[in-house]
Amino acid sequence: MTTIQQQRTSLLKGWPQFCEWVTSTNNRIYVGWFGVLMIPCLLAAAACFIVAFIAAPPVDIDGIREPVAGSFLYGNNIISGAVVPSSNAIGLHFYPIWEAATVDEWLYNGGPYQLVIFHFLIGISAYMGRQWELSYRLGMRPWICVAYSAPVSAAFAVFLVYPFGQGSFSDGMPLGISGTFNFMFVFQAEHNILMHPFHMAGVAGMFGGSLFSAMHGSLVTSSLIRETTETESQNYGYKFGQEEETYNIVAAHGYFGRLIFQYASFNNSRSLHFFLAVFPVVCVWLTSMGICTMAFNLNGFNFNQSVVDANGKIVPTWGDVLNRANLGMEVMHERNAHNFPLDLAAAESTTVALTAPAIG
């Protein structure tokens, strides 16, 4: 009994030091308990992604024995290459390497894709938790991790929720540049995402956030308090940790209030920076919600053949032009996996060309 107790004591002797090191804010890079989960997951995802991008064999993404190559060694470049999503034959089944009969089978069915996205999603979730943890240790407010939840929600939407709704991980976003574009085209063709209000909010958040960031940066830079001569860099006029304001917010407020109108300009630095944070974050949240609803085929607005004249004849609109583009993309994607596109098979026949009204 004494021997067993001594062995346990020796094994646990370094545990307090390990705990102190993990939670110490004096480390050059904070680890944290979430970091203990984050680091191995992100390393595994990055390692598998790099190896698969370079050397993975073609993947039978559609489940029809027509493999699609995505790696460098099979003729792709940095633009066309991707980690190809797992096969439609696998569907939503969890497909770790031990579920396959051989490694060749695992590679052929796109096993690396699931390995990468699952470790990646766990890793970025742990990174978000680590942001909260470090804020807590330093006595800061927790809004940094709340802001980071916006891109995390987007990643979960395209890598997890959308495949769940569509019934297969083969519908997830490929891990590559051209693959991402293909995902976007197919998403538009099948769900009309450009006509979804939540996607519109996301566009407003991205472009609006960029605009507000540029406006704020240029206003601050233009109203710096002079601390240097003409021959010195203006950056030398600021010392890290100084108590004095480095720019004149009254001047910036006065300029912008006169450029637009008074109440378009913030007179409170705290409310200004809160707005700069919350606007793009909420808009990206809305976009993620839109992806999640369209995953279950609650799609964007449909204005096909919505305008008719007094005789009941259809007057083509831009809604019909957009519908033609969607149909064109839909008939061309996964060409050999379908006998006929679902949208064309389930609806009335659509004219191939928009006809001009007869004159006279």
Swiss-Prot record:
MF annotations from Gene Ontology: chlorophyll binding; electron transporter, transferring electrons within the cyclic electron transport pathway of photosynthesis activity; iron ion binding; oxidoreductase activity, acting on diphenols and related substances as donors, oxygen as acceptor; oxygen evolving activity
**Short name of one Pfam family for this protein?**
Photo_RC
Gene Ontology biological-process annotations: photosynthetic electron transport in photosystem II; response to herbicide
Question: How the cofactor binds, per note?
Answer: The D1/D2 heterodimer binds P680, chlorophylls that are the primary electron donor of PSII, and subsequent electron acceptors. It shares a non-heme iron and each subunit binds pheophytin, quinone, additional chlorophylls, carotenoids and lipids. D1 provides most of the ligands for the Mn4-Ca-O5 cluster of the oxygen-evolving complex (OEC). There is also a Cl(-1) ion associated with D1 and D2, which is required for oxygen evolution. The PSII complex binds additional chlorophylls, carotenoids and specific lipids.
Q: Which reactions is this enzyme annotated as catalysing? A: 2 a plastoquinone + 4 hnu + 2 H2O = 2 a plastoquinol + O2
In chain numbering, the residues marked as site (Stabilizes free radical intermediate) are: 191
UniProt site positions, description: Cleavage: 345-346
Membrane topology is:
Multi-pass membrane protein
Entry's EC annotation = 1.10.3.9
Annotated site location: Tyrosine radical intermediate:
162
GO CC, alphabetical: photosystem II; plasma membrane-derived thylakoid membrane
The entry sums up its family as follows: Belongs to the reaction center PufL/M/PsbA/D family.
**What interactions and quaternary structure are annotated?**
PSII is composed of 1 copy each of membrane proteins PsbA, PsbB, PsbC, PsbD, PsbE, PsbF, PsbH, PsbI, PsbJ, PsbK, PsbL, PsbM, PsbT, PsbX, PsbY, Psb30/Ycf12, peripheral proteins PsbO, CyanoQ (PsbQ), PsbU, PsbV and a large number of cofactors. It forms dimeric complexes.
Protein name as catalogued: Photosystem II protein D1
Species of the source: Prochlorococcus marinus (strain MIT 9515)
